[in-house]
């Protein structure tokens, strides 16, 4: 009985899941750098694939260079733990009207070792994880703003 009441309450408030399978008509413009290519590909996959420049919504993203901070040190002073942080600012437009203008940041920690190959692999993995976090944050905000726009 409780489940039925909950179902009726959710249905009456016009609940609509954010990722309900609807394809969103968003063109994601090119983003500078290799990390930008990865971010653009990840965003395009969230929006149902690549869209043409004449799509209803246009998303312009600017991705800053990664910032690396030391987080842990050995007694000898060598760094053993680092954090990489990426920040992306974006503007979502419906034609010429700006409907969202914000920035998102994401960070990931990784082990920094003395071996160059292992250290580079850890760094690259942390950057990729950070890009996917940014993609999740930006796509969630964009889809929410689009749904608000279409419900007005």
Model-flagged regions — what are they?
Residues 16-18, 49-50, 68-70, 145-148:
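Short beta-strands and strand-coil junctions in structured, solvent-facing domains, enriched
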Residues 14-19, 34-38, 150-152:
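Flexible, low-complexity charged segments
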Residues 13, 26, 123-152:
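Compositionally biased, intrinsically disordered linkers/stalks adjacent to structured regions
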Residues 45-46, 50-55, 60-103, 109-132, ...:
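Surface-exposed short loop/turn segments
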Residues 31-46:
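N-terminal targeting signals for Sec/Tat export/insertion, comprising classic cleavable signal peptides
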Residues 12-29:
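Bacterial Sec signal peptide processing site at the extreme N-terminus
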Residues 1-13:
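Sec-dependent bacterial lipoprotein signal peptides
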Residues 25-32, 58-60:
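Short hydrophobic beta-strand segments
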């Amino acid at each position: 009985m409780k489940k039925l009441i909950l179902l009726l309450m959710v249905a009456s408030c016009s609940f609509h899941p954010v990722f309900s399978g609807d394809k969103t008509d968003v063109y994601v413009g090119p983003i500078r750098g290799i990390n930008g290519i990865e971010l653009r590909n990840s965003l395009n996959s969230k929006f149902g694939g690549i869209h043409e420049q004449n799509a209803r919504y246009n998303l312009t993203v600017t991705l800053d260079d990664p910032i690396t901070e030391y987080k842990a040190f050995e007694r000898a002073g060598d760094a053993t733990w680092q954090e990489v942080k990426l920040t992306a600012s974006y503007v979502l437009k419906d034609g010429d009207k700006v409907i969202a203008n914000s920035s998102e940041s994401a960070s990931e920690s990784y082990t920094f070792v003395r071996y160059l190959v292992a250290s580079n692999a850890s760094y690259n993995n942390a950057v990729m994880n950070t890009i996917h976090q940014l993609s999740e944050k930006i796509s969630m905000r964009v889809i929410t703003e689009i749904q608000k726009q279409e419900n007005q």
